[in-house]
Swiss-Prot record:
Superkingdom field: Bacteria
Protein name (database record): Large ribosomal subunit protein uL30
Assembly: Part of the 50S ribosomal subunit.
Native source organism of the sequence: Desulforudis audaxviator (strain MP104C)
Keywords: Ribonucleoprotein, Ribosomal protein
Keyword Ribonucleoprotein belongs to the record: yes
InterPro entries, alphabetized: Ribo_uL30_ferredoxin-like_sf, Ribosomal_uL30_bac-type, Ribosomal_uL30_CS, Ribosomal_uL30_ferredoxin-like
CDD domains per UniProt: Ribosomal_L30
């Protein structure tokens, strides 16, 4: 019974949210990011990829 290892994404907030639209702020918060240079690990699923794509100019993404 071989289980597939789920891949993860390391997402780091590198730009400030000051002056950003509310939709971008909500997307960052929904990813679990609350402050600058904070890193979270999320599952690599289409929903998370879509959220990251909307704020790609604010975050740094790495494969975990």
């Amino acid at each position: 019974m071989a289980e597939k290892k789920k891949s993860k994404l390391k997402i780091t907030l590198v730009k400030s949210l000051i002056g950003r639209p509310e939709t971008q702020r909500r997307t960052v918060r929904a990813l679990g990011l609350t402050r600058m240079h904070q890193t979270v690990e999320q599952n690599d699923v289409p929903q998370i990829r879509g959220m990251v794509n909307r704020i790609r100019h604010l975050v740094k993404v790495e494969e975990a």
